[in-house]
Amino acid sequence: PRMASVQNEYSLLCRLYDTDMAEMAVNEDVTLLSFSPLACGLLTGKYQNGAVPDGSRMSINGDLGGRVTDRLWPAVQAYLDVADKHGLDPVHMAMAWQRTRPFAVSAIFGATTSEQLKQILSGKDLILSDEVVKEIDAVHKLYPMPY
């Protein structure tokens, strides 16, 4: 049987898939099951300014599996700034960005609470404007793969 999907970490902050894997997936009609589209919660903004909420992933694993680097925080802030500039919930922006990709993506997200699940699902119909996508692309050029 042929491969139907691959599961890779994929988010605004982690785009290794964009190199050769995306081309293979398009050519072979393979869907990406992207995990951690919110980058372990980093793209929610909840960890900004040194905050570590009780019960959060960072409270259990301080470096989020090696994701916390010196280059991380400016990148996260830049994406949060794009969302803020356009009046978008950063969670909704990060999830909607997955649907802008030129290959098939189905995002696998995690929610610890029902409130988090409601927040994610309430943005399911968001379509990012070309302007927002261009600004996201500009941030990526400034901060490619911060971890």
Predicted feature locations:
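Substrate/cofactor-recognition hotspot
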Residues: 146
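Beta/alpha (TIM)-barrel catalytic core signal, keyed to glycine-rich beta->alpha loops juxtaposed to Asp/Glu
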Residues: 1-138, 143
